Regions:
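Interfacial segments of alpha-helical transmembrane regions
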Residues: 2-12, 72-79
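Hydrophobic transmembrane helix segments
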Residues: 4-53
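Conserved binding/catalytic microenvironments
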Residues: 26, 55, 61, 98
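Alpha-helical transmembrane segments of polytopic membrane proteins
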Residues: 45-55, 101-110
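Juxtamembrane helix-break-helix junctions at the cytosolic face
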Residues: 59-74
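Membrane-helix boundary connector in multi-pass membrane proteins
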Residues: 70-73, 77-80, 84-105
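Membrane-water interface at the C-terminal end of transmembrane alpha helices
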Residues: 109-129
Length: 129
């Protein structure tokens, strides 16, 4: 079970790192030079700081549930939803931009969601809910 905890802590750390980056200078998370168009993530970020909040919630849920060894499956499922939402917004937004926006971050986010889903299954197989 130590391996599951280690990976869960690392995954929580990745979400919390994104929060810190989002709260830092915008040059750390926004790519200039896409043109006058804005991505879907930027549109939502301009309304409210949704993504720092979502990544904080996801990271803290995974961190605390792993420490307590309770609710880990649900925490990873929530984190998977956050990463999938973020990744899909990046990828779908890139489709509509001319020229298309880079999709690397969106692709990484989708795979992070898949890894969180896999971790939720791995914890469930260990009998931890």
């Amino acid at each position: 079970m130590r391996g599951l905890k280690f990976v869960s802590y690392a995954m929580a750390g990745s979400a919390l790192t994104l929060t810190v980056l989002y709260l830092g200078p915008s040059a750390l998370v926004r790519r200039e030079g896409i043109g006058p168009q804005t991505t879907l993530v930027q549109v939502i970020d301009d309304i409210a700081p949704v993504f720092p909040l979502l990544f904080t919630i996801a990271g803290m849920l995974v961190l605390v549930s792993t420490l307590r060894t309770r609710g880990v499956v649900i925490a990873h499922a929530v984190a998977a939803g956050v990463w999938m939402f973020y990744g899909l917004l990046i990828l779908l937004g890139a489709i509509f931009l001319e020229p298309p926006a880079p999709v690397l971050t969106g692709t990484i986010s989708i795979w992070a969601a898949v890894m969180h889903w896999g971790m939720s299954r791995a914890w469930a197989e260990q009998g931890v809910r």
